[in-house]
């Protein structure tokens, strides 16, 4: 049986989420909210210290940015009965981190009547013991007015910063609809990358984000994903089948689509992502956001092939972005990319894996229609995913085309799949709630 694994960053995020959930918090969002926001909606809800402030990645001539915080676009939807105890997980971006601008963050809101700093400190201490063990002690260290560093003192005498917390400012209170002065609004920010490096003994973020199977296969766990979205279900199913989740590139180089044989010419606008104002990457070559995840997938397949891996089964779930046309807002979607190669993997076995995945998601009425049109694929082994009405479910899979394999240096037959999550969610829901006419 293949090892069941979980990326150390995602393992850490789940540990922290569960630490707050068992103490009464609700997981408001598990990575679904948009990562691209209008530049005029970038606001500050509390006064983070300078070392925790992120510089936004500007897009499309400065009209949009990749978010630097999770709460600003979501906090107004959290209005309701007190206490409010909400948690958000997702990716934020820092323009100063040229090679790895994406960070996994957890942010939270705790609002109720007369919450003193000591009350919040006691709560955070309980949560920290769920993360670091019962010998750990959490304390709030003031860094400036109304702002504290959450310091974890471990049983070996060492200390680590869990995150930052402080009182929400007037804007945070207004967005929450809080007018009563006796109601305190505490906000929380945790850089999951930093905690993951500590828990998994990674000396740098570069090591944390390595995608070599030799490293990722060491992170064994059969614990399910902390979440109940369809993307979470996908992760559990694929992990159970021996697929390893990686974290692919989220900002592509200029030739990404040409390299995977997906770009057909200047007229082909489907594969031109949102442009960065300032290029990122090691050599300043990363210039646009992905419209699909498959270029990143092929990079990781190639990296592992060159490292001598005989068998690779991987997947990635992340956001993709389509630029707005004719003055319209950009479109953001959550996508799934799956890849595999190995002596026991061929077109038939990979197709069977895709069939099992869809069936276990509750999508029984799916059909695979062969096609020789998509140029990134091996045209002898390529399928579109359709429903019973022959409507496209925004999914396709097959062999990676010869040109792409040559461009990436992949010396074996390899296979990939590309899905959008929302159409799968809608299809699964329609089948789950379907009532035959004779039973209505």
Which residues does each predicted region cover?
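TRNA-recognition modules of translation machinery and tRNA-sensing kinases, especially anticodon-binding
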Residues: 1-440
């Amino acid at each position: 049986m293949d090892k069941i694994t979980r990326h150390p960053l995602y393992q850490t995020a789940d540990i922290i989420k569960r630490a707050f959930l068992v103490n009464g918090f609700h997981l408001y969002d598990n990575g679904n909210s948009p990562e691209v926001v209008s530049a005029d909606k970038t606001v500050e809800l509390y006064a983070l210290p300078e070392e925790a402030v992120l510089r936004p990645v500007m897009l499309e001539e400065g009209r949009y940015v990749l978010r630097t915080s999770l709460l600003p676009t979501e906090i107004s939807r959290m209005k309701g009965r007190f206490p409010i105890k909400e948690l958000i997980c997702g990716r934020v971006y820092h323009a100063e981190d040229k090679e790895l601008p994406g960070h996994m963050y957890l942010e939270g809101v705790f609002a109720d009547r007369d919450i003193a700093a000591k009350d919040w400190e006691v709560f955070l201490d309980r949560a920290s013991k769920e993360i670091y063990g019962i010998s750990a002690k959490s304390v709030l260290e003031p860094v400036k007015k109304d702002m504290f560093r959450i310091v974890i003192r471990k049983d070996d005498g060492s200390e680590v910063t869990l995150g930052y917390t402080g009182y929400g400012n007037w804007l945070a209170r207004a967005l929450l609809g809080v007018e009563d002065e006796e109601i305190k609004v505490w906000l929380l920010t945790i850089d999951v990358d930093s905690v993951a490096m500590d828990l998994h003994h990674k000396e740098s973020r570069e090591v944390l984000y390595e995608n070599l199977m030799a490293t990722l296969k060491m992170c064994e766990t059969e614990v399910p994903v902390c979440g109940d979205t369809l993307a979470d279900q996908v992760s559990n199913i694929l992990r159970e089948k021996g697929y390893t989740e990686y974290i692919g590139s989220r900002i592509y180089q200029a030739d990404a689509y040409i390299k995977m044989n997906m770009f057909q010419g200047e007229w082909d606008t489907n594969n031109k992502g949102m442009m960065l104002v300032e290029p990122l990457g090691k050599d300043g070559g990363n210039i646009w956001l992905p419209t699909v995840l498959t270029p990143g997938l092929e990079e990781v397949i190639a990296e592992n092939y060159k490292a001598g891996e005989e068998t690779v089964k991987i997947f990635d779930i992340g956001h993709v972005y389509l630029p707005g046309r004719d003055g319209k807002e950009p479109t953001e979607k959550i996508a799934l990319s799956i890849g595999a190669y190995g002596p026991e993997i061929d077109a038939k076995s990979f197709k069977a894996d895709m069939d099992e995945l869809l069936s276990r998601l509750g999508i029984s009425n799916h059909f695979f229609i062969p096609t020789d049109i998509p140029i990134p694929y091996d045209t002898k082994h390529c399928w579109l995913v359709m429903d019973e009405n022959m409507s496209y479910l925004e999914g396709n899979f097959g062999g990676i085309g010869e040109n792409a394999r040559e461009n990436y240096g992949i010396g074996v037959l390899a296979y990939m799949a590309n899905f959008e999550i929302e159409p799968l969610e809608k299809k699964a829901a329609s089948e789950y709630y379907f009532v035959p006419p004779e039973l209505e």
